Amino acid sequence: MGFLKRIFRNVFRDGAQVGTTSSFSKLSEEDLEAHLRVARYGDFVLTDAVRPSYDLQVVPTQGYRHDEYYDEESHARVPVVMAAATHDRLFETFMDLLDPLGFEVDVVLETSHHREGRGHTDLYREHIDLPVLKSILWDFEEMLLNDGCTGIAVLNPGVPMEVQFDEHKLLIAYGHDLEPFEEVLRERRIRCNDKLKFITEAEHVHSSSDQFAREFEELKMRLGMDCGFEE
């Protein structure tokens, strides 16, 4: 299926001024389609889920960097590792990053299939054995890799640690001990670069399809999720 037959959402960097001109706004249909067909940037290959701005404000690159998450409720600061991996390493890296979480985990599915603009719906499933979860996720590998309206988070609140595979297909790990996650990334030859910029830090476009929306509903059913919370 061609990109122009998919569903698109332009997403601007946080804090962008209202009325900011999109790099896509004056493109012909042919130029837009040509840009959206490009998946390879040097050695890095994107999935179908997302494409960078036409003017390449951020060039997709493999690597990871350290960051910090501030919880406004608890006023706690949690160390974070954010990573981008090329297509052929991405899903296996995500699966390997789940191992440090332990045997029993909670799962959050994030969807923006039926929402306009910003915002998404989160669906929760508590207490699932990690081997069972992995088996289910492998069945939905193509959708999870290529659907720009689906994200997933897996967490162990007792540790606490969390791994996200978000809508942009970035890998994000939270926890006070990040070494187990960094070890996985190094084993996958994903190198640390704390100056790395991610596709989320500039204008970009998401891609989805009706087929992926249907597969999301099937995944939701397989995980025993009924209702969710909008954000």
Predicted feature descriptions by range:
Residues 2-170, 174-231:
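Structured alpha/beta or helical-core interaction and ligand-binding surfaces enriched in interleaved
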